[in-house]
Each structure stands twice: as C-alpha cells, then as structure tokens.
Amino acid sequence: MDKHRRDESPSGLSDIVEHDGLLGTGLTTRHIEAFGRKVTSTAGHLIGPTGDGNPAHYHNAMADIQRELRRPNTQRRVFALTQTTPTDLVRSKLSTSEIQSRALSSLPDDLLANIPDDSSSYSLFEGFQASQDDIEYRKAHRRRASKSKKLLKDGENRAALPSAPAELKKERDLLSRRMELMGVRKNMCSSEIHDIDNKIANLHNMRKIVLDRLAGLEMEEAELEHELTELENKLEDIQEETPETAVVGTPKSSANDESMASEDPAMDASFMSESIYQKIPSPKSLKHKSKRKRSMPILHEHFSPGSLIKEMEAHTDMVTAIDFDYPFGTMITAALDDTVRVWDLNVGRCTGFLEGHNASVRCLQIEDNIVATGSMDASVKLWDLSRARSRPRSSRINKHEDEEDAADDASQVSHSTTLEDCHVFSLDSHVGEVTALHFRGDNLISGSADKTLRQWDLVKGRCVQTLDVLWAAAQADTLNGDSTWRPSGRVPDASADFVGALQCFDAALACGTADGMVRLWDLRSGQVHRSLVGHTGPVTCLQFDDVHLVTGSMDRSIRIWDLRMGSIYDAFAYDKPVTSMKFDAKRIVAAAGESVVKVYDKADGNHWDCGAGVGADEQGPLPATVDRVCLKDGFLVEGRQDGIVGAWTC
C-alpha cells in the first residue's frame, strides 16, 4: 500500500494533474511551466540590462520568486486568485472599519472643503436613519405587542410568563431609540416648514414688486394712449377744416367783376346771404368719433377678490347713479348734490362736470364715449365725451355761492371744470322724472314716473314709440281672459319708482315696475310678450343675458329667471331691500342696505361680502351704506350714501 502511494507521487500526481488539471480548472502543468518561463523571461529582461548598476538583492529577490512560483501550493493559490473578483479580495482582506477609514481618507480635498456647516445637533446619518421606512418594524412590533397585550384570566398560571428583564430592557431601549428618531423627524419637518414659509414670503415680495411694475406700465400706457388719441383728433379736425377753408376763401375779383356786382343788386344780396350762412354754426352731428381702446387693463385680475383698488370722495351727498365703460376706464357718477362728474379710474381723478340738467340725475349709462343721463327734470340728455373741451366751472344747479364754495372745499376733485361742446341733444317728451334708461346702438329706452316707456331714435333725436305700461298690462290680461288689470303682489310703494329698471336688446325689452312685475316687451308690436310673477315688492334693478334674467326687489330678494322657460331658476334673499344689482360671467353683486356689497358666486353658490364695511370695528364708526353698484369683468365700483365711491376687485 505504501509503495503504491509512493509510486503515485510525484509521477502519479503529475499524471493526474496532466489529465484532470489543477483544482478542476482545466489548467495543466504545461500551462504552469509556460507561465513560469514567461515570468522568468520578463524578470530577466527587466533586471538583466541594468544588473551591473543595481544592487545584488534584486537578483536574489527574483530568484526567490521564481523558486516560490514553481511550488504546487503557490501555483494553486495564484490560479485561485485569478478567479476571485476584486470586491471579494477587498472584503477578504479588509475589515469594515478599514473600509470606512480608507473611503474617507480617499476623498479629495475639494469635496471635503465643500461640506456645509450645519448647526443642527443631529448628524446626517441620524437623519438618514430617521427617514428610513419602518414598515417591517411595525409589523414585527405589532405581532409582539399583540402577544404581550393579551388579557390574563384569573385561572391562568402567572408563573409561566417569561420574566426576562433583558428583553424588557431591550424593548425599552428600542422604544427610546424610536422616540429619538421621532424627535429628529419632527425637527426635520419643522425646518422644512420654515424653509417653505421663507420661500413663500420671498415670492410674495417678488409678486408685489412685479405688480407695482405692472401698475406703472399701465399708467404709462394710458398716458401714451391719451396723447395718441389727442393727436388723431387734431388730425381729423384739420382734415375737416381744410375743405371749409377752401369754400370760404374766394379769389380776388377784378374791376369788371366789381362793376358787375354793383350793377346786379340781386347778386350782391345772394353773396351776402352766403357769407352770413358761412358764419352760422352748423348743427351738431350725431356722428361721434369712436373711442377705440387699444389695450385693456389687466392689473385688477392679479389682485385677490375683495381687494381695494381706489377710494374717492366723489360727491357731498348720496350717490344716485354710477356706471363705467371698462376697468380703469371712464366712470360717470351722479348724486343728490345735483352734479354729474366724469372720472378717470386709472388715476382716480375727476376730469370734469356734465352740466345742463335742472335737477338731480337719477339714472345714467356710458357706452364707449356716449353718455345718457335721465333726470328728475323729466329730460334725457345725450353727451359725447370725445368732443368735450374743459373750462372753469361758474356755478351749480340750485346752489348759492356759499354752498358752492363749501362743496368745492369738501370735494376732493383735482380739476373743477365743465366739459363744453359734449352735449348732443335733449329728449324732453316725458312729463315725469326719468327713473330708468338704457340704450344700445341707435335706440334708447327711457322709463318715467308718468308710467310710460319711450323709445328714442338717437340718429334723429326724436321719440318713435310710447308704451303705456298700465294700458299694455291691461291688454295682456284681457287676452288672457281677465277684463280688469290687477297688480300682482302688494300695493305699490309710494316711495318706490314706478319704473324701477329696464334693459333692451334689439326688439326685446325687459322692464321691472313698482307692482313687482317683470314684463318682457316686443318693441316691434309694442305689446307685452310675457310677464314674470314672483316678487312681492317693487322691482328696483334687473339685468339679463342670453339665458338668464336677474332681478332685485324691495322685498329683499334676488331672483334668477330662465328666459327660455319663464320660470325661476334660483333665488336668495338678504336682510334689507335690494336697491342695486349687477352681474358678470362669474358673480352677482348687490347693494342691500348695508355698508358692504353682497357678492354671490355663480359657480359654487357661495355668498361673501366686499367693501369698506368688511372687518370694520363695531364699536367705531361704520362706513356709509352702499346704495349703488356696478360690475364689469371682475371690476367693482360702489357708491355710498355719503358720496364716497370705492373701486374693488371682485
């Protein structure tokens, strides 16, 4: 047996290695010998040429390496090393602490210099541990808690319970650690909230700066547009005066022409008539210069709803009518101080007065540069602001000199001037005060206390149709089978206007009266097409669009009607009578006897207040009651009983 074993070594081992390879790798002794020869030749090549100049220990070291590589154990270790990855090699040679130390020591100085200084008492690693997901821990903890929280019955053996203080301490330490992690997480969340608050504050400051810049741009834009409009008007005036100058200018006549003129007196009379005719001013034309708006203001769109834009001390008495053409455009106000004022909303300044009525103006409307005013003197006047010229005001209607001076001092008006040459004509067919009017295109409809509605042709300046409200209502009841006219609702209030509000569109006319009825008229036939019954008090305001008609009444309610069905679509009420109402695409605003404007959102149905009375101290003086409102494109203007006018975003 021993001899047989001795025979196997080394020739037997070499045969096995020759046949099977080393360690099952497929490498034979031939490969090993070839590798050894290559190492020897390489070492000899490196050391041989410079052997004379190098120390002798280099040669001895290379000889030792060659002898070591020829040993089978060394060869097996070398070939095993060739099959090992670098990661496994590092893991097998280095400990965890050494790996961390080498990783930190290998960082470049630039990265180490850019590490931010943090005053937090928690390290980055603690924050990372605190932000790790703990689902698995919760599951395991829940299972342990469910086992440990079972109720003990009286008959159970308490001695069988494991009393292991080590486990309890371990659980306590674990919970304490989790409490620390919760504290770290809370502080991290608090820091994030502070950072977000700082960012929001910075964004608000940036937004305010941009809003101020936008306001300045719109101011400059308005000034440029005003200058451009003045230049265009001057060019048009020059073009109109040029042909007149050509007609008036006559060539120099010769001596023969003079003798012929002296011989023919009829010709001389004709010449004098023509000369006088040229000096007679031509009647005012109804054609007016269109006021083209080249750009629309957008500043109010970036304010939060309910923000104050401007507040003006417009009048010294209660505002009775108010209207404007577009946001930051031209506003017209009328009050019981017998004045009608024109305002530039862009700067909040009064640009002049419209004088001509003999009493207070109850209703008005502005469309482009045309203004219509209805007064208690039973007249309707039409004004063209594009032809206005300013002059110092001389007097006011029904005011003494002392009262005029006091009123001028109390009113904050920059330019006390009267706008001349803007009056077009007067419509004087009514015999009672004009309480409502509306015009569109060349048609104007006016309602009066004489219980009539009149349709006016603005081109010719004359009345083309008179509608008797009582007679038309009686005729409508007769057609429905009732021979007598009876007002629906309560008896008309003596203090209410008989015609409270009206609006026209082409041949359609909606009119609200003191009997609480809303009548829809057909101007082509002059008949009532439909009557809307629902209000129990005088109708004070109305407005309609393509689908709905909204009405406000002294019965404290606002009703929204479906024009297609003739039925009530929605309704809501306030604590006091509704005196004025307007709506746009998003909201309905109303004046309901309070110091605020009542706002109703169409989309979500919410009610909220807007105006100077919002947030006012109940112990201090409250702002005056809002009596008139006007809303266009989210721009709200309200007039109060003390004469103050405020502009708000809505």
From Swiss-Prot:
Pfam families named in the record: WD40
Main location: mitochondrion
UniProt-annotated location(s): Mitochondrion outer membrane
SUPFAM superfamilies: WD40 repeat-like
Keywords from the named record: Coiled coil, Membrane, Mitochondrion, Mitochondrion outer membrane, Repeat, WD repeat
Region described as Disordered: spans on this chain: 241-261, 393-413
PROSITE patterns on file: WD_REPEATS_1, WD_REPEATS_2, WD_REPEATS_REGION
Family: Belongs to the WD repeat MDV1/CAF4 family.
Biological role stated in the UniProt entry: Involved in mitochondrial fission. Acts as an adapter protein required to form mitochondrial fission complexes. Formation of these complexes is required to promote constriction and fission of the mitochondrial compartment at a late step in mitochondrial division.
Protein name per its UniProtKB record: Mitochondrial division protein 1
Species assigned in the record: Aspergillus oryzae (strain ATCC 42149 / RIB 40) (Yellow koji mold)
